[in-house]
UniProtKB/Swiss-Prot annotation:
It comes from the Eukaryota. Changing T8V: Decrease in antimicrobial activity against S.aureus and better against E.coli and gain in hemolytic activity. Expressed by the venom gland. GO terms for cellular component: extracellular region. Changing L3A: Decrease in antimicrobial activity, but no change in hemolytic activity. Antimicrobial peptide that exhibits broad-spectrum antimicrobial activity against both Gram-positive and Gram-negative bacteria. Also shows antifungal activities. Exhibits potent activity in stimulating degranulation from rat peritoneal mast cells but not from RBL-2H3 cells. Has little or no hemolytic activity towards human erythrocytes. Changing L2A: Decrease in antimicrobial activity, but no change in hemolytic activity. This is Anoplin. The C-terminal amidation is crucial for activity, since the carboxylated peptide has antimicrobial and mast cell degranulation activities drastically reduced compared to amidated peptide. However, the carboxylated peptide has no hemolytic activity, like the amidated peptide. Changing R5F: Increase in antimicrobial activity and gain in hemolytic activity. In R5F/T8W; gain in hemolytic activity (EC(50)=2 uM). The keyword Secreted applies. Its main location: secreted.
Length: 10
């Protein structure tokens, strides 16, 4: 998903 990708960066 997209949110998961962002959460990984954070």
């Amino acid at each position: 998903g997209l949110l998961k990708r962002i959460k990984t960066l954070l």
